[in-house]
Amino acid sequence: MKKEINFLGKRVRRVFMILSLLFVIIGMYFFFTKGLNYSIDFQSGSVIYYKLSSPLNSNQIANLRDIARSFYSKSTIQTGSNGKEVWIRTKFLEENELKRLTPEVEKVIVKYEGREITTIEPTISRELREKAILAAVLAIIVMLVYITVRFRFDFAISAIINEAFVLLATISIFAISQWEVSPSFIAAILTLLGYAINDNIIVFDRIRENSKKYPKEDFTIIANRSINQTLARTLYTVITTLLAITPLLIWGGVVLRPFILAIYLGIIIGTYSTIYIASAILCEWRELQK
Amino acid sequence: MNIRPEIKTAFIVIILGIAIWILLTFPFRYGLDIRGGIRVTLQCQKTEGVEITDDAVRRTIEVIRNRIDQLGVTEPSIYKEGSDKIVVELPGIKDPERALEIIGQTALLEFKDETGKTILTGSALKNAKVEFDQVGQPMVRVEMNPEGAKIFADFTSKNVGKQVFIVLDGKVISNPVIKEPITEGTGVITGRFTIDEAQKLAILLRAGALPVPVKVIENRTIDPTLGKDTMESAYRAGVIGAILVVLFMILVFRFLGLVADIALLIYVVLDLAALKLLNATLTLPGVAGIILSIGMAVDANCLIFARMKEEYAQRKTPMASLDAGFRNALRAIIDSNVTTILAALILFYFGTGPIRGFAVTLSLGVALSMFTQITITRTLLENLLSLPVFKKATKLLGL
């Protein structure tokens, strides 16, 4: 028999569980004090985006800032791709205000490859946010029911705590780093919740199978063996998924980058949490029952 | 299921044939983020005496659709969102400002007498078109329906010498004096119009007034060059990603990996064909979802093959380990994929625009990959593993 790695030893798993909890607590502290950096889709405001063929110099950027601030004093100018992309963010501008702002801006930015203007009123954003929360809650309930039916109730609870951890950990990372949260972020979060539960269920399936095969064996040993047995598959899938999306991160353009970044995080968090959240909780639970 | 391998093979070949045919004949429908255009969200405004009911919103959408049809936009999409919002998406439009003016204007036309009493509204009109007077000044000729014509004839015969006020959205656009009774049910609206203004007015009058006024609360103008650039680079990145996955599978699982790669290729063909068949709108996050699904599709194979390796260590024949590998891995694959599809369904139900597109591509990808990576891989392997070559050369199988 191949040598097994002891993932779920009592001390190791408790250290990791406490560290995970600490991370989420710090993340939530940031979430409640600093909040998330919502993209314009979640808040009211106007953004004018330009893609340029040659980068702007600092003089031009200062000019743009002055122009935008003459409309709204807290406007910001953000550049990307070495100055070849510009975002001008202001408060919500009415049609006629936008019609005055853009010609002024285009006195500075004379030539551009592409332009995108987005304006959103606050009512929309509230609805979007509420829908996102509702979708997350519903997804969790549906998974809880499905796993209880297919496995056992304690499996379902561990899996849901695992999902909650993945969600909170991702939000923590975005709260601490202040990366922008856009609508595709919601799609990404739901995908990575799917990825995490996928990974989780593959391991739980092995635990279910091994528990039937060796009903007398200590549960923690069974769980640890199951993780070891599925380790090869876990590794392969992490690699193939990363291979598929990494080119997109490199060459896929700015628009998709936050989405792919969130998927990356999800793969790492999901793989980790299957072991140190889902399986670890299940072990604690079973040891308590003894 | 005990279906003979030949029948399964024939079934797969037929499906693949249909998919390739669809792929070659049907076009892709790209979302606004790729094609460019405008996306406007309108909110219906409550006014005196008019409540925002479902019916009012529906009729408003109808009028907006009529107006857009006259603009000649290809594949516009107009739909209700929430209780009182209307989303209008116009792909590939050249003059977004003009379109916005035409969509958003209430265009309530009223004929009023000198006391300000309304005699007729725009709903009494049958047609409106642009004409020119002797000096080439544009004007709009309106044609009334029979009841309208009768009311107007009555009114004009009683009020010769008085003024009639033609009011659009509360603003007087002309106030001619009635010289003689107008009985034939046509009239002209003159004003100091430019040709463009006259054309716009004619469109608005033909399509009718909005039952409730609307306000633009979200307005996105997306330049087509941006989306096209991203699409092209995403396409290239997707191809590179797929090649990397294919190579990895061969490297790790040898011949088994190659078979999984063939199934993966079939998966991509089926997936794209299904998207075309469903006329799904392909957005940028949707494209990312397709690429992601290529990486995740082979997960089933990794599970099965990893299991086959384990089983082979105990059973020693490729066929027996194939059977046990599939049988044992299937449970885990189904349980994990069903949960993913459930999550995707919730996304679809609550999501909007691009997110819905993403949910469609995700769940379609999971369902199809289960078919290709399990059924097709198995059928191929059942046919191939009985070949004499594999009796001894198990190294080739990567077991």
From Swiss-Prot, chain B:
Keyword Transmembrane: yes
Keywords assigned by UniProt, alphabetized: Cell inner membrane, Cell membrane, Membrane, Protein transport, Translocation, Transmembrane, Transmembrane helix, Transport
Gene Ontology CC, one term: plasma membrane
Molecular function per GO: protein-transporting ATPase activity
Primary site of residence: membrane
Localization (cell): Cell inner membrane
Coiled coil (UniProt feature): none
Transmembrane feature ranges: 7-27, 239-259, 262-282, 286-306, 329-351, 357-381
Alphabetical list of Pfam families matching this protein: Sec_GG, SecD_1st, SecD_SecF_C, SecDF_P1_head
UniProt topology in membrane: Multi-pass membrane protein
GO BP terms in the entry: intracellular protein transmembrane transport; protein targeting; protein transport; protein transport by the Sec complex
Stated role: Part of the Sec protein translocase complex. Interacts with the SecYEG preprotein conducting channel. SecDF uses the proton motive force (PMF) to complete protein translocation after the ATP-dependent function of SecA.
Family: Belongs to the SecD/SecF family. SecD subfamily.
Assembly mode: Forms a complex with SecF. Part of the essential Sec protein translocation apparatus which comprises SecA, SecYEG and auxiliary proteins SecDF. Other proteins may also be involved.
Listed name of the protein: Protein translocase subunit SecD
Species for this entry: Dictyoglomus turgidum (strain DSM 6724 / Z-1310)
Gene encoding the protein: secD
